[in-house]
């Protein structure tokens, strides 16, 4: 299985880069992992809805350049479906059994995802009703994908 993370913006903090590198290494025995960072747009303070829509659309165009037609696309959205770790593992496992060979997880920028990206999504996933920094969300997502593969493989993992 190939897992791709498409994210908006670059990681600057060393501690986050280290955590991403650690989970990338751990995941290498379960899947082929690719992380793609697309450039983010600067959002002016007090930006209007129209300006924010334009920013989301620009970032969305950059994201969609990397989305393959045959990939199963999961967008991270505050209004998405909340799953337990076991349910996420089951979803990944079922997709593989059904013949899906490529899952793309998309994490938007600070103001979310554009309409075209949301239209292309096969599944909207939420980790919480709370808002998290998109940089930290990468680490949380990678940890949950790693946990999913441990569950699928019936291997122990901290609960």
PLM ranges: what are they?
Residues 1-27:
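N-terminal beta1-alpha1 ligand-phosphate binding loop
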Residues 6, 34-36:
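General small-molecule cofactor/ligand-binding pocket signal
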Residues 11, 78-81, 109-111:
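Short glycine-rich anion-binding loops that position phosphate/pyrophosphate groups of nucleotides
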Residues 15-17, 84-86, 115-117, 136:
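Short glycine-/acidic-enriched loop or helix-start segments at secondary-structure transitions
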Residues 31, 70-71, 121:
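Short, well-ordered alpha-helix to beta-strand connector turns
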Residues 39-101:
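S-adenosyl-L-methionine/SAH cofactor-binding core of RNA-modifying enzymes
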Residues 86-128:
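A mid-sequence interfacial segment
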Residues 115-159:
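Structured adenosyl-cofactor binding patch, chiefly the S-adenosyl-L-methionine
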